[in-house]
Curated annotation (Swiss-Prot):
Subunit structure: Homodimer.
GO terms of molecular function: rRNA (pseudouridine-N3-)-methyltransferase activity
Catalytic function, reaction form: pseudouridine(1915) in 23S rRNA + S-adenosyl-L-methionine = N(3)-methylpseudouridine(1915) in 23S rRNA + S-adenosyl-L-homocysteine + H(+)
Organism per entry: Shewanella amazonensis (strain ATCC BAA-1098 / SB2B)
Name of the featured protein: Ribosomal RNA large subunit methyltransferase H
Pfam families per record: SPOUT_MTase (PF02590)
């Protein structure tokens, strides 16, 4: 199974890249974590934010392989505990499809992305910097995998 993290933004600080790659490399081959970066639209004083959001959404949806289970990371989504995320990960594996998780840009996700999603996950009620979300999601997915596989990484 492949977990595909599709995120808006391409020039991340080194600590974000290193943090994401640390958890990415921990996954076994049968549970690969892949990052797809979507260039953020140019934002300025007179930017057409609705158009930028739409274009980012189109690029995100185009990056999703046909048949993938789509999960958005969005405030109105479901708040999962770590065991609930582990359960969701287990269900995704049993479903037999790869999973695409979508992280929007500063204004969030395009309506088309939200409509295409089968599930929505609220990572936190806090507003988190989008670069940090990549690392937190990678760690959370690895922790969920470790629970499902009785790996000692997660401790109760």
């Amino acid at each position: 199974m492949k977990l595909q993290l599709i995120a808006v933004g391409t020039k991340m600080p080194d600590w974000v890249t290193r943090g994401f790659e640390e958890y990415q490399r921990r996954f076994p081959r049968d549970m690969a974590l892949e990052l797809v970066e979507i260039p953020a639209g140019k934002r300025g004083k007179n930017a057409d934010i609705a158009r930028i959001l739409q274009k980012e959404g189109e690029q995100m949806l185009a990056a999703i392989p046909k048949g993938n289970h789509i999960v958005t990371l969005d405030l109105p989504g479901k708040n999962w505990t770590t065991p609930e995320l582990a359960s969701a990960l287990s269900k995704w594996q049993l479903d037999g499809r790869d999973v695409s998780l979508l992280i929007g840009g500063p204004e969030g996700l395009a309506p088309a992305c939200k409509q295409a999603a089968a599930q929505s996950w609220c990572l936190s009620a806090l507003t988190l910097p989008h670069p940090l979300v990549r690392v937190v999601v990678a760690e959370s997915l690895y922790r969920a995998w470790s629970i499902n596989n009785n790996h000692p990484y997660h401790r109760e």
